[in-house]
Amino acid sequence: MFFRNLTLFRFPTSLDFSQIDSILPNARLRPVGPLEMTSRGFISPFGREEQEVLNQRQGDFLWLTVGSEDKILPASVVNDLLTRKCSEIEEKKGHPPGGRERKRIKDDLIHELLPRAFVKKSRIDAMLDLRYGYVAVDTASRKAAETVISEIRDLLGSFPALPLNAEISIRSMLTSWIAGEPLPEHLNLGDECEMKDATEGGAIIKCQHQALRCEEIDKHLEVGKQVSKLALILDDHVSFVLGDDLVIRKLKFLDGMLDQLEHSDTDGIRAELDARFALMSAEIRRLFLLLEVPLKLSKANN
């Protein structure tokens, strides 16, 4: 259990989470109904089989998991059946069904197919840092992250979380780092970047598995390309790719952090998950605080 991507939001640190244990059962994921397309709700971070514990809290860190059940009903299947049904009607009546009747037929087909459709189960994890007021959602999709925030908002009744933004140009900052400007302490360049022309629709250059301080990169900078994604390493603990959208992708925890698991008491799966969450949360906080000042990240009003 380690997050692989981070989409970040800020929320006021004055929010009260003291009742989280008592209200979570009311927002538990229920099975998707026979005639429903989707169902969402909270599940245990420790797996769907766990019915009692619907969150995990360690100090200022809160771990929530939103589970989903989605019916798989391909549009191609529905459209094929609709075409066949409309052809049968045309043969009987001598003319194709009109738009309104066609819509009714399609709705009837979906109603008929839904109870037999396969169900896809998924989960998205989120870590809330109650001390510093940010949410790290384990996805690179803004839409999926907003779904998690919406579930938390429904749970609490109010959750004024806003997408993370910066007061400076992230592209300009990333470009300056790759051009040789000093990076924040403990950060080093990785071996991957994406560069774009400043003009809309311009060329995009992607570099992987290479040194980023080199003549080839310098030539792209000289003609005005800017860095839109940049691989970075936090000590020997965390590697990641920071985008100009402030989404952290390809998050990977390295030996410097993982070695600490060998010295922790992880007797059993639950204890190991607890230890992993504690270490991961601490590293995400360290990374967030390290980036907060140079990138002038937004704060939420308390």
Curated annotation (Swiss-Prot):
InterPro entries, sorted: RdgC
First-listed, main subcellular location of the protein, grouped into a coarse class: cytoplasm
Cellular localization per UniProt: Cytoplasm, Nucleoid
GO biological process entries: DNA recombination; regulation of DNA recombination
Record has Cytoplasm as a keyword: yes
One GO cellular component, as annotated: bacterial nucleoid
One GO MF term attached to the UniProt entry: double-stranded DNA binding
Keyword flag Metal-binding: no
Top-rank lineage group of the source organism: Bacteria
Keywords, ordered alphabetically: Cytoplasm, DNA recombination
Similarity section: Belongs to the RdgC family.
HAMAP family tied to this protein: RdgC (MF_00194)
NCBIfam families, sorted: PRK00321.1-5, PRK00321.1-6
PANTHER family: RECOMBINATION-ASSOCIATED PROTEIN RDGC
Its biological purpose: May be involved in recombination.
Name of the protein: Recombination-associated protein RdgC
